[in-house]
Amino acid sequence: MADQSIISALVLGLIEGLTEFIPVSSTAHVLLAGHFLGFKSPGNTFAVLIQLGAILAILLVYFQKLLSIALALPTSVKARRFVFSVLIAFLPAALIGAAAHGFIKAVLFETPMLICVVLIVGGVILYAIDRLPLQPRYTDVFDYPPSLALKIGLFQCLAMIPGTSRSGATIAGALLMGTDKRSAAEFSFFLAMPTMLGAFTLDLYKNRDALSFDDIGVIAIGFIAAFVAGIVVVRSLLDFVSHRGFTPFAIWRIVVGTAGLVGLWLVG
C-alpha cells in the first residue's frame, strides 16, 4: 500500500463517519476533500464500503433499541406504528432515488460550485430554523404519526442534491413540522437506517462489475475509520443538539461552503 493511498483512505473514512449523521453533508465534504486536497477515493469498492462502515456504526449503537422494537412488534401497537412511520418516511427517497440515481451521480456530483452554494444556502436555512421560536408538539419519536413521518420523508428527498445533507433535510423538516431538536435528530437516525442501506444496496448493484478487493488493506482502513468515527458521532449527537442546537453545524456549513467558493475562484 502506498502511503498516499493509506492517508487518503483514512481521511475519507473519517470524513464519512464524522459527517454522515450530522447536518453538514458527508457527500459535500468527501467530494471537496477530493477536489482541493487530492484525497481521491481508491476505487468504487472503497466508496461503497466506507458507507457500510457508517451504516454498521449506527446499527451497533442502536442495536438494543432496535431489538426491543422488534420484540415488541407482535404485542405493541405503538411499536408497529413507529416501524410503519419510518418505512413510510423512507418511501419517497426510495422511489425518487432509484429513478434518478444515474443523473444524480453523473451530473450533480460533478459540480463543486453547486455543492458549495448548497452548503451555504442550507447553512443559512438551518441557522434560521434553529433560531425560530418554535413550540414543539412532538418530543418522542414513538409518538410521530405516519402523516408527520411522510412529510419528513419528503424533505429527505432534497438531500439528493449534493451538499444538502440527508440528516439536515430531515431535521429541518421535522423542526418545521413541530418536533423538538432531540427527537428530530433521533428520527433522522432511524430514517438513516433503511435509507443508507437502500443507497448502499443500489450502489453495490450499480458498481457490481467494477468491484475489486485488490486493495483490501486500503479498503479496511477506510471502513474501520468510518465505523469508529460514526460510533462516536451517533453516541454524542443527541446530547449535543439538546444543549447547543444546530447552529454550530449551520455555521460550519457556511464556512466550508464559502471557503470552497473562494478556493474554486482562486485555483479552480
UniProtKB/Swiss-Prot annotation:
Q: Which organism is it from?
A: Sinorhizobium fredii (strain NBRC 101917 / NGR234)
Pfam families membership: BacA
Q: What else is known?
A: Bacitracin is thought to be involved in the inhibition of peptidoglycan synthesis by sequestering undecaprenyl diphosphate, thereby reducing the pool of lipid carrier available.
GO cellular component terms, alphabetically, are: plasma membrane
Protein name, UniProt field? Undecaprenyl-diphosphatase
Q: How does it sit in the membrane?
A: Multi-pass membrane protein
Coiled coil (residue ranges): none
HAMAP family recorded = Undec_diphosphatase
- Where is the chain membrane-spanning? 5-25, 43-63, 84-104, 106-126, 184-204, 213-233, 248-268
User: What task does this protein carry out?
Assistant: Catalyzes the dephosphorylation of undecaprenyl diphosphate (UPP). Confers resistance to bacitracin.
**Keyword set, alphabetical order:** Antibiotic resistance, Cell inner membrane, Cell membrane, Cell shape, Cell wall biogenesis/degradation, Hydrolase, Membrane, Peptidoglycan synthesis, Transmembrane, Transmembrane helix
Q: Which GO MF terms are attached to this record?
A: undecaprenyl-diphosphatase activity
One GO biological process this protein is involved in is: regulation of cell shape
- Identify the EC number(s): 3.6.1.27
